[in-house]
Amino acid sequence: MTDPRILVLIPARMAATRLPGKPLADIAGLPMIVHVLRRAEAAGIGRVAVATDTPEIAAVVAAHGGEAVMTRTTHPSGSDRIHEAMQKLDPEGKAEIVINLQGDFPTITPQTIREVLPPFADPAVDIVTLASQIHTEEEDLAPSVVKAVGSPIGPRRLRALYFTRATAPYGNGPRYHHIGLYAYRRAALERFVSLPPSPLELQESLEQLRAVEAGMRIDIMIVDSVPRGVDTPPDLETARSILSKS
């Protein structure tokens, strides 16, 4: 039985710059958004819904037995979209934790989604996200790979200090590839979307730095691997290859 205090929201829109229409791209016989929806449902942690500004996406989700909520087309980020969806789906405020699961993670595992929950046992934690250790120089140097920099507070847990597209931290020791899945306390999400974009957020083009600069606590759980995101046509072909074998 899922927990009514947890809401899993999947933002999805058709107007992606590098791969327009990607939520409905076919992967092994199903639209990509349906793969993500089913993995979120399999996690079994809370109510799951797709937040979209596109009636076609909402119709596909409904046709596959999922829940969709229509949101405005003008949102600057996925966080703003899930905030509107949260208000529509849960006006009574029963949901205490809101998870923002990217709609372009068709290979993410249910267990990976569950990993964001344990840190909320500490009431000081505002936001939880994920990262995986970097093992290749290519990953280490790529600006497209966001690095999570944090102080260890457990064997697989960091307290976030910074996020950057640069290679960081300097020197010997592990570096971590940030995974763009976020879980917010409801009050933290409310605060986050009320804040203006911050200087470092604009410089790095990383919205999580808005929370860091505002003094919000972000904990990072370390997972074994990075789920394959789909941003380009080659990414889509890779996802098709992986899921056609599963």
Swiss-Prot record:
It comes from the Bacteria. GO terms for cellular component: cytosol. Its EC number is 2.7.7.38. InterPro entries: Cytidylyl_trans, KdsB, Nucleotide-diphossugar_trans. Its main location: cytoplasm. The keyword Nucleotidyltransferase applies. Pathway: Nucleotide-sugar biosynthesis; CMP-3-deoxy-D-manno-octulosonate biosynthesis; CMP-3-deoxy-D-manno-octulosonate from 3-deoxy-D-manno-octulosonate and CTP: step 1/1; Bacterial outer membrane biogenesis; lipopolysaccharide biosynthesis. One of its GO terms (molecular function) is 3-deoxy-manno-octulosonate cytidylyltransferase activity. It is an enzyme of class 2 (transferase). Signal peptide: none annotated. Keywords: Cytoplasm, Lipopolysaccharide biosynthesis, Nucleotidyltransferase, Transferase. It holds the Pfam family CTP_transf_3. Gene3D superfamilies: Spore Coat Polysaccharide Biosynthesis Protein SpsA, Chain A. It is found in: Cytoplasm. GO terms for biological process: CMP-keto-3-deoxy-D-manno-octulosonic acid biosynthetic process; lipopolysaccharide biosynthetic process. It catalyses: 3-deoxy-alpha-D-manno-oct-2-ulosonate + CTP = CMP-3-deoxy-beta-D-manno-octulosonate + diphosphate. Belongs to the KdsB family. Activates KDO (a required 8-carbon sugar) for incorporation into bacterial lipopolysaccharide in Gram-negative bacteria. This is 3-deoxy-manno-octulosonate cytidylyltransferase. It comes from Bradyrhizobium diazoefficiens (strain JCM 10833 / BCRC 13528 / IAM 13628 / NBRC 14792 / USDA 110). The gene is kdsB.
